[in-house]
Amino acid sequence: MKEFENPPPITVAIGLGRSGVAAARYLNDQGEKVQIFESSKKASFGKLSGNLEKEGIKVNLGVPLNFSSFQPILEKLALVIVSPGIPWDHPTLNQLRKRGIIVESEINLAWRALKNTPWVGITGTNGKTTVTHMLNHVLNNSFIESTIGGNVGKAATEIALALRKSTKHKPKWLIMELSSYQIETAPEISPEIGIWTTLTPDHLERHGSLENYFAIKRTLIANSSIRIYNADDKYLSKNRLNLPKGLWVSAQKYNSNINQLDFWISSNGMVIEQGNELFHSSALQLPGDHNLQNLLLVSAAARKIGLSGMAIENALISFAGITHRLEKVDKIIDIDIFNDSKATNFDSAEIGLKATSAPVILIAGGLSKQGIYLDWINQIKEKVCAVILIGESRVKLQHLIKSHGFRGEIVCYEKLDKAVDKAIKLGVKFRAKSILFSPGCASFDQYSNFEERGDHFKKLIKESSINYKL
């Protein structure tokens, strides 16, 4: 009789972020009994919680990630789904594992659902988002349907749910950006093509060392059938013998190791594939040598997928770049203004400075991260006439920049609002060519993510520019 049947097992998804919500909806659609645990009680969660409850997903707000939170449902708990931001070795997760409860990541759940469609797995400290968008653009422009997701765009389980419900043609390729947090929790993922853009110190507060960070990224590439590497990255080149065989690309026009390369750019700017000219690199309109590296990584993948050089060239001509990455947002009194909010570490911020015309007014700061800063400071000394620092790290960064010999003006503000107004005034004063918002820090001291931070910057620029365009 029904009243004596065992109650259905419970699945808990951790967090009301993009991944947690997507996983909960995916499993709920499969008929699972799903709850979400969210440690915050933010009022902004009210509408989302209400919508999820209507769908049959119970939302528990103000529930911390500790073992006692699970005890009321422990006997019925079968599965816990974890978002990328939660450390894989979190003590509570280890306690649950000891009780025999399965702990799985959102990205691994998605892999099991989507593995019959070939993946391009793209990882790296910097460059992976641009490569993801650029490759997706090239494929779709060439009538090869693809979808992006993972660490950018839609959560992977959101894609899985959409494809399950869709009556349309399925995409031929999934272009998935994968962070070290995701790779660490999903050793099963085996892309058809794996792309490794760069490797510099990042997320060391979680991974402990650069060697551990390297080993995690390497897992994804080792699992890939076709591997593509950036030979211009010092760490990757140095560790070439420790990496599985693959294709190597270089944007350095006079690379001394040209015999070890598969794709490169010639002295006259032509993209070369193993000695054969494909097209001129000027097809891509984005500034900076780093974007030539991105072009080559995308070209190598596109060629393996089957596109001609002409098809790649035609697609690149119309690629306008991505939001928040060296995004030109305005021009005020002959000063170009760039939103580079996606620069969340020193290495990425250094790349932004390299690609920007001097003299530069730099706005930087936020929540500080571990990393190597000397190259970033050298770029500041070479190209920047004034620095405006914001956020939690502003005093620390001011001391750092001054102590390394920067002689320009440095101003500190807590909030971005005052920084933008000051940047324009300093730009006029010093006849700057560029104002660059390239934080070199995480956004979480004042914003939910780098996108929110970048949107705020663009809003402030729009408001301020009115005074200079009357």
From Swiss-Prot:
User: Which pathway does it serve?
Assistant: Cell wall biogenesis; peptidoglycan biosynthesis
Q: Name one GO biological process term.
A: peptidoglycan biosynthetic process
The primary gene name is murD
The protein, known as = UDP-N-acetylmuramoylalanine--D-glutamate ligase
- Write down the species: Prochlorococcus marinus (strain SARG / CCMP1375 / SS120)
Recorded GO MF terms: ATP binding; UDP-N-acetylmuramoylalanine-D-glutamate ligase activity
Instruction: Give the protein's function.
Output: Cell wall formation. Catalyzes the addition of glutamate to the nucleotide precursor UDP-N-acetylmuramoyl-L-alanine (UMA).
The cellular component terms of Gene Ontology attached to this UniProt record, alphabetical and capped at eight, are:
cytoplasm
- Catalytic activity, EC: 6.3.2.9
Which family does the UniProt entry place this protein in? Belongs to the MurCDEF family.
Q: Catalysed reaction per UniProt?
A: UDP-N-acetyl-alpha-D-muramoyl-L-alanine + D-glutamate + ATP = UDP-N-acetyl-alpha-D-muramoyl-L-alanyl-D-glutamate + ADP + phosphate + H(+)
Positions with a binding annotation for ATP: G124, T125, N126, G127, K128, T129, T130
Which subcellular locations apply to this protein? Cytoplasm
Q: What class of enzyme is it?
A: ligase
- Which Pfam families does the annotation name? Mur_ligase_M (PF08245), MurD-like_N (PF21799)
The protein's UniProt keywords, in alphabetical order, are: ATP-binding, Cell cycle, Cell division, Cell shape, Cell wall biogenesis/degradation, Cytoplasm, Ligase, Nucleotide-binding, Peptidoglycan synthesis
